[in-house]
Each structure stands twice: as structure tokens, then as C-alpha cells.
Design a protein with these regions (language model features):
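Short amphipathic helix-loop junctions that connect adjacent transmembrane helices
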Residues: 31-45, 225-241
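Cytoplasmic helix-loop-helix junction between adjacent transmembrane helices
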Residues: 104-140
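Helix-to-loop junctions at the C-terminal end of transmembrane segments
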Residues: 61-74, 157, 256-268, 352-353
Length: 405
């Protein structure tokens, strides 16, 4: 399946670095959204239109991801996408006109999607070699990266440091990190079976898994792009304070993911997801309808903690289905998830024009509640029908002595 690897720890660290990079650069864009909305005098609807740039770019990247992995391998694609993403983040953040922001988001969405697909294939490979559940911890580093990006950006905004300086620091640092990551990642020869233009979309046993990923990541995208604006609209806070809900959302998500593997071992995958999504529903209701800063922050923290393990668990399950290949299964699941991540904020912007932003958040909350029903119904049935040997989140073989730990 793959070439021999001498040192597992540096490889796992490289995959962690890829997830951290993607999360940090995402947080770097997100922290500037309220500022850009104010500087460019955008309405909720106009901002929603601009965010279509990221959605279109993401969808294009998802369509290209599977054949590009087949052509170049997940290692090369991951390295190249990380370098380019660190460079193009400047365009949406620093552009002086709405249409340039839109164009920048096209590029950002495209390369973010390529990085996400390729790093997830790498993570699935490392998890398989290690013969233990690691996907939640990998995604935990994405959340830590996002939290770090939002916190660092919010601090610089508070200190009134120029966005140009902010972006220069981020670009220089993460281009360096991306080059090191590229050097350390392993070749996965199974990648080469993904030849030709093959659009990855979840069908059969992957369909309910992909649906819950869609709902979970849609909610994550809405919180990322609109939580700060909701806080500014309802409580009139400044730009730095507006970054607080998403920062707490991310750190709560990171905590959930770092303890998620142990929670799954103790309580089971489906119970973990169902209880988590239910917690997210309660948190979103608090954040939306209780107009107090502390309660809003706590509510978004509950939402982050509750959503934290849904996507990692389901992506790990999809990778173990592996039909027709691991890369295809992961790409198919990630595709619909990231469609939710990037189209959710766009749709909420349009919906907010019609029914007001708090009510639009209520629609999102209803979607999360629907996810609970799907987990307890079709997905649980799928796990039982497919059998533990294919859908189990843990390899039944004993862990080797030269594991990634």
C-alpha cells in the first residue's frame, strides 16, 4: 500500500502541521470579516454574495481534489496547496473593493479545499498504520489553528496594527511551515489508483455519513462568518470583541477533539455524536436568543464542544469503508461537508435579509437537530449492517511496537 517509513512521530507531526496551517489561515480570514463588512459598507445580503466566492472556489477544489491526488499524490498536493494558500490569503483580507474580495475568496476556497482533502487522506493513512483512532486529534489541531488565527488576528486588531503587517507575518511563517510539512509527509501509493476525472460524491453507505458532515460543517461555517456579526448587531461590541464567540467556539471544539478518541472508546461513536449534536443545539439556542455577552460566548462554546467530534468520527468511518478507495471515500465525505461549510454562510446571509439574522440561526439549529435524528437512525443502522470489520472506528489488530505514538 505504501512505502516503508522509518520515523512515525515526525510524520504525524507533519500531518498535525497541515491541519494547524489550514485552521490558522481560516481564522485569519474570519477575524477580518466584521472589519471588511464595515469598511466596505456591506449589508448582510451583500456580504452573503461576496461569500459565494469561497463557496464556488471550494466546490471547484473538491471536484478537482480526487483526480489531482491520483495524478500527483496526496503528499505533493498537500504541500503545494499549503504554500499557495499561505500566499493567496492576502487577497481577500487586503482587497479594497468587494469584487476583489470575491476573487480572492475564489482562490482561497479552491486551495483550502485541496489542502483539506489531501491532508485528510494523509491523516487516514497515518491512522491506518498506527492501528488506532487518531482522526479527532488531527482535527483538534485544525481547531487549535483556527483559535490561534482568530486570537492572533483579534489581538492585532485591538492593537490597531495594520492588516498588511498581519498578513505579511502569516504568509512568511506558514510558507516556511508548508515547505517543512511537504518534506516530512509520506508517499501513499494507493493515491495512484485515483486516476481520471472522477467526481467524488457520497452514495450508498456514505450518503447518511456525508449528510451529517454537511449539517455539522454548515453550522461551523455559519458560526465562523456570522457569530461576530450577530454579536455586533445585538450588543454593539467592537471588532476585537466580536472575534470572541468564534475563538471560544474553536477552543471548545479543540478540547472536544483532543479527548474525543477516548470518549468514543468509552461510550461508542454514535452515542458520542448524538450527545454532542444535542449539546450544540442547546448552545446555539442560548447564543441566539439570550442577549448577554457571557451567555452568548458560553452558548457558542457549547456548540463548538458538541460539534467537535462529529466530522472526525464520520470521516474516519468513511475512510474505513474505503469504497472504491480510501481517497475517494474521504473526498466524497469531505466534499459535501465543505459544501456546507462554505455555502452555509452564503445562504444565511440571504436568509437574514428575509427573516433577520437571529431567526436564520434558528434554521441552522434545526439542521443540527436533524443531524441527531440521522445519526440515531440511518447511520446507526448502516454501522450495524456493514459490520464492525468495515465500519469500526478501531482496528481490531493489536497495536504494533513501532506505532506513531
Amino acid at each position: 500500500m505504501c512505502r516503508p517509513i522509518r520515523f512515525f512521530a515526525p510524520i504525524r507531526l507533519a500531518v498535525f502541521a497541515a491541519f494547524f496551517t489550514n485552521g490558522f489561515l481560516s481564522g485569519t480570514w474570519i477575524v477580518h470579516i466584521p472589519r471588511i463588512k464595515q469598511v466596505l459598507h456591506l449589508s448582510d445580503g451583500e456580504l452573503g454574495v461576496i461569500l459565494w466566492g469561497a463557496a464556488i472556489g471550494l466546490f471547484s477544489g473538491m471536484l478537482c481534489g480526487n483526480p489531482l491526488i491520483g495524478r500527483f499524490g496526496s503528499r505533493n498536493l498537500c504541500g503545494i496547496a499549503a504554500i499557495v494558500l499561505a500566499l493567496v490569503i492576502a487577497v481577500p483580507v487586503l482587497s479594497p473593493t468587494p469584487w476583489l474580495v470575491f476573487a480572492g475568496l475564489l482562490l482561497y476556497g479552491f486551495f483550502s479545499a485541496l489542502l483539506d482533502i489531501s491532508m485528510t487522506v494523509q491523516a487516514a493513512y497515518v491512522e491506518k498504520v498506527a492501528k488506532r483512532q487518531l482522526m479527532s486529534s488531527f482535527h483538534g489541531f485544525w481547531s487549535v489553528g483556527g483559535f490561534s488565527g482568530v486570537t492572533f488576528g483579534g489581538l492585532l486588531l485591538h492593537l490597531t496594527i495594520s492588516p498588511w503587517i498581519h498578513i505579511e507575518i502569516c504568509t512568511l511563517f506558514f510558507v516556511t511551515v508548508a515547505i517543512w510539512t511537504w518534506w516530512r509527509l509520506p508517499e501513499v501509493t494507493e493515491d495512484q489508483s485515483n486516476t481520471g476525472i472522477q467526481i467524488a460524491f457520497p452514495t450508498g453507505v456514505l450518503l447518511p455519513i456525508g449528510t451529517v458532515c454537511f449539517l455539522s460543517m454548515l453550522t461551523e461555517g455559519v458560526v465562523a462568518d456570522w457569530a461576530g456579526i450577530l454579536l455586533r448587531t445585538q450588543l454593539g461590541v467592537d471588532a476585537a470583541t466580536a472575534a470572541l464567540p468564534y475563538a471560544v467556539f474553536l477552543i471548545s471544539m479543540a478540547i472536544a477533539r483532543f479527548i474525543g478518541d477516548r470518549i468514543v472508546e468509552r461510550f461508542g461513536a454514535m452515542n458520542t455524536i448524538a450527545v454532542g449534536l444535542s449539546t450544540a443545539v442547546v448552545g446555539l439556542l442560548l447564543a441566539t436568543f439570550v442577549h448577554h455577552l457571557i451567555v452568548v460566548v458560553i452558548g457558542f462554546g457549547m456548540a463548538g464542544f458538541g460539534l467537535g467530534n462529529a466530522v472526525p468520527i464520520l470521516v474516519s468511518a468513511a475512510s474505513k469503508v474505503g469504497r472504491p478507495t480510501v481517497a475517494y471515500a474521504v473526498t466524497a465525505t469531505a466534499t459535501v461537508g465543505y459544501v456546507g461549510l462554505f455555502t452555509g454562510p452564503v445562504l444565511i446571509g440571504s436568509l437574514a435579509q428575509l427573516i433577520q439574522l437571529p431567526n436564520a440561526f434558528l434554521v441552522v439549529t434545526a439542521g443540527v437537530a436533524t443531524g441527531v435524528v440521522i445519526v440515531l437512525g440511518p447511520i446507526r443502522s448502516t454501522f450495524k449492517r456493514e459490520g464492525a470489520e468495515k465500519m469500526s472506528l478501531h482496528d481490531p489488530e493489536p497495536e504494533p511496537q513501532d506505532s506513531l505514538g
